[in-house]
Amino acid sequence: MSSVAVSDDLERVADKLVGLTSRRDPGSAPGGAMRWRPPLAEPAVAAWEAEHGVVLPEDYRAFITRVAGSGTWPFHGLRELGVPDRDNDLSHLDPGRPFPCTFTRPLVCDPADEDPYWDALERGEADRGWIPLCTEGCGMDTILVVAAADPEVRGTVWYFDLANDC
């Protein structure tokens, strides 16, 4: 994606965020009114990438360094890069190791045979190659894949509903 295309996209997204802020029902998510926090500093993002051995997808990186670093929406809010929640939920993640799932081989629990699913979780397979974008709470999370064995998967957004899988 060219830098001009990214800039145009970011401008459209920023305009839409302003419109969403004025239309959002303040009772629909915790924390009241929707707020977007300032963009993250480029050196801080570069340091995070170096620490974890990954390069963030260009469009996400541009958004968090030029539009908003985090916010109070959607759901429980857009997570700030590298900042754990109150339960220190990032301590188990390894964003630099490849995300093991693919579009044809997602992590799915088969109620008829749950063992492979639970074995994969025990091995930490669900904790590799991604960063959290936001959470609905109770184990329902939207994630961004930042490292993947399958190059087509890197940069895609997945929904983890580990609380309700089996």
Q: What is each PLM-predicted segment?
A:
Residues 1-137:
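A surface-exposed partner-binding patch
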Residues 130-132, 141-164:
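Low-complexity, glycine/alanine/valine/leucine- and proline-rich hydrophobic stretches
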